[in-house]
Every structure is written in C-alpha cells, then in structure tokens.
Amino acid sequence: MSFRSVLLTALLSLSFTTTMQAAHHHYHRYTDKLHRQNHKKDLISPKPTEQEACNTSSLSKELIPLSEQRGLLSPICDFISERPCLHGVSVRNLKQALKNSAGTQIALDWSILPQWFNPRVSHAPKLSIRDFGYSAHQTVTEATPPCWQNCFNPSAAVTIYDSSYGKGVFQISYTLVRYWRENAATAGDAMMLAGSINDYPSRQNIFSQFTFSQNFPNERVSLTIGQYSLYAIDGTLYNNDQQLGFISYALSQNPTATYSSGSLGAYLQVAPTASTSLQIGFQDAYNISGSSIKWSNLTKNRYNFHGFASWAPRCCLGSGQYSVLLYVTRQVPEQMEQTMGWSVNASQYISSKLYVFGRYSGVTGHVFPINRTYSFGMASANLFNRNPQDLFGIACAFNNVHLSASPNTKRKYETVIEGFAAIGCGPYLSFAPDFQLYLYPALRPNKQSARVYSVRANLAI
C-alpha cells in the first residue's frame, strides 16, 4: 500500500469522524436570517445560558413544545408570564419570550442604499452615411446619481405543533423595494452594463415565502407546500443576500437564473445522512415576479421543476457546503422561452475567520443577457472580535453575455470586482461602504471600465 493511499484514508477517516460529531448546516436564506437575528446578544440583556449560546440548529429546537399549551389564549398568557420587560425593555428579551411562548421567530431587515456611479450617460455610436435609414436609432440614457434604494424584508416562522407526529412550521417572507430619484435599472442603462448594480434594480413587491412544512418524526423527511423561491437555496452565506453581503447583481444572487421570484408549488426534502440533503419539487410556471399569490394558476397545467442536492461536510478546517441545483422552466406569456438552468455552489470555512466561496451557473435560451457566470470570493466575519456584525468581503464575477440577447451587446464578457466592509454599530445597526469595478462593460465599446460607490445602512432586528 502506497503512502498516498494511507494518507488519503487517514484524511477521509478524520473528516468522517469530525462529521459524525459536529452539526451540519445546509444554507437556506430565510431560515438562516431568522436564526441569525434571533440569537443576537443585546447590550442590556442578561447573559444567555450555555445551551442557548452553543445551539446552532435552525428554528425551534429550544422551543417549549406547543402540545403543552392549553387553550387558544395560552400563548398570550405564557408571553405575559415570561415577563420580558422585568429587567428593562430589550428587543432580544421580547423576541426570546415570543419564541418560548408562541413558537414564533421574527426577523426585520430594513436597509437604505444610496449608490453613486460613473459614467452617467450612455454612449450612442456614430452612424456612417450608409447606416442612415437602415439602422435603428439608439436613444441616449442619462442618469443623475445617487440612486436611493429603500428595501424592507420582514420574515417570520411559527411552529404550529411539535409532537410525536412531527413538527409543523409556517414560514413567511416578503420583500418591499422602493426608489427615490433614479432607480438602478436606469443607472445600469446609463453605464451600459449587462448586469445591474444591485439585486433589486427597480420597484418590487415579492412574496418570496409563504409555506407550511411538515417535518416527520425522524427529522430526515419534510414536505413543504405553498409559495417559495429557489433563490432561498441557490447560493452561500454572503453571495445571496444584498442586505447582508455583496450588493452587485452578479454577486448577490444567481445572475443567470430564470426561475420565479416566488410561486406556488411543493417540494419534498430528504436527508439520507446528517451531512446530505436532497430536494425535488415543482412550481406554477406563470407567476414569474412573485408579486402576489395566484392560486388560479395551479389549474393551468404548466409547471417548473427542480432538483437540488447539498453536501455539508465538516473537516479539520471547518464546516462547508457544496450544492447543485438543476431546474427547468416552461414557456409562458411572462417568459416567452423554455429554459434549463444549473447552479453549482461551493463554500468552505478555512478557519473561524476566513470563508471562501464560488459559483458556476448557466442557462439555455436568451431570456436574459447573462447566460454563464463564474464567481469566487472570500469573506471574514468579526475579524477583530469587535462586533458580530463586522464583515469584510471581496469577490469577482466573470459574466458571459449572449450576443443575441440584446441588440446593443458589443462584448461577450463583462467582469465585476466588488469589495465591502460592514461595520457594526451595536447589535442591530451596521454601515457598509462598498465599491464595484466593472471591466469592459458589455454594451459600451468605447469604455474600459465603470465604477459604483455605495454605502449601505442596515437595521436588522
């Protein structure tokens, strides 16, 4: 037996041993947000117990079983008996009392994002005398910085029952986006970019989650029905949420995605082992925007399908997650082309302070200009042990632009480099200066770069 075989066997054994002894984490955008904001330490709150500080499970393992509650008003009585304001008003104590008495977790995220950009005017190429009468006239777009984005995202999870028959959890999440002055879509047109400068380039209302999940007693099988979005699982900790991590379109979500922002359907999730998770499901194909819940669409017999596999190992370096998402969308009036897409995500803690991640995604068809993307980056949370909200990140995305998706496309590729530094101010408020550098804008042949400067103020309760 060679030395390499022995070394490989030893490393695999060490990884397996560590895996069996440690908790595994499969990323879910809204569940993670609820868990993160319901485990914050308040400046005036009493010191949490050892069990609370060490618990890393999502949602409600430390909740009082709802089967012990008697009567409809018992949650209110239990909340009063918790006396959350006994030692002064504390957001953390109020949320902890609500969780213990009614099995409810709440997260409120409100961010204000001003963005300054350059160039400010789009470029119209000069036409030769042969072009007159034959080429379409290109309009010039001018935008005045800054564009101000106001984004509000409330989320909640309610454990309806927790008994020997399993656990029933209702989850809801809604995103409201408004702009003052210019919006990001106009700014992107002026800069002539294939990708937007943030995750929500225009005014939006998104019902991204409205689901009921039945977790069966063995905790390895769950069935979820209702309105949901694949954006919740397509990503890693910091490249899938504009309010927490990176801001640019290519680094805050899957820029090639053609699936819905929220649509009715169902999915079955199975966990063969503690470190693996498999999911298969379907959705109504008509509701692309997710702005409302459209029950009547379920009878139109057009559905999108997806399959998802996740592996969350824990080795001597730290925890990680590696996932693959495959999906198929149907042709509907709101999206006049059938597509098939994929997204491969990888993330790994190299140490307790260093987190690396990457994504490779693509899609068939010509629904959006970007049809392939390769991105990678790193982030460091609470590097100086000053505030848990401190976060530093830098990443790069290479976007392949389909020439036939837009008549003005001049380049096949567009690259964005982004860096930010989130600075926590207390347990709930943070400020994050952010810089985006776009190399070779896809729609602007006379310009080698474009720049975006942002300052994100985020209140996370």
Swiss-Prot record:
Keyword Transcription regulation attached: no
Gene3D superfamilies per record: Carbohydrate-selective porin OprB
Domain of life from the UniProt record: Bacteria
Any single Gene Ontology cellular-component annotation: cell outer membrane
Annotated membrane topology: Multi-pass membrane protein
GO BP term, example: monoatomic ion transport
GO molecular function, one term: porin activity
Signal sequence extent: 1-22
Pfam families: OprB (PF04966)
Compartment(s) of residence: Cell outer membrane
Keyword Membrane found: yes
Keywords, ordered alphabetically: Amino-acid transport, Cell outer membrane, Ion transport, Membrane, Porin, Signal, Transmembrane, Transmembrane beta strand, Transport, Virulence
Family as reported in the entry's similarity comment: Belongs to the OprB family.
Function: Facilitates L-arginine uptake, as part of the AaxABC system. The arginine uptake by the bacterium in the macrophage may be a virulence factor against the host innate immune response.
Protein name: Porin AaxA
Annotated source species: Chlamydia trachomatis serovar A (strain ATCC VR-571B / DSM 19440 / HAR-13)
Gene symbol of the encoding locus: aaxA
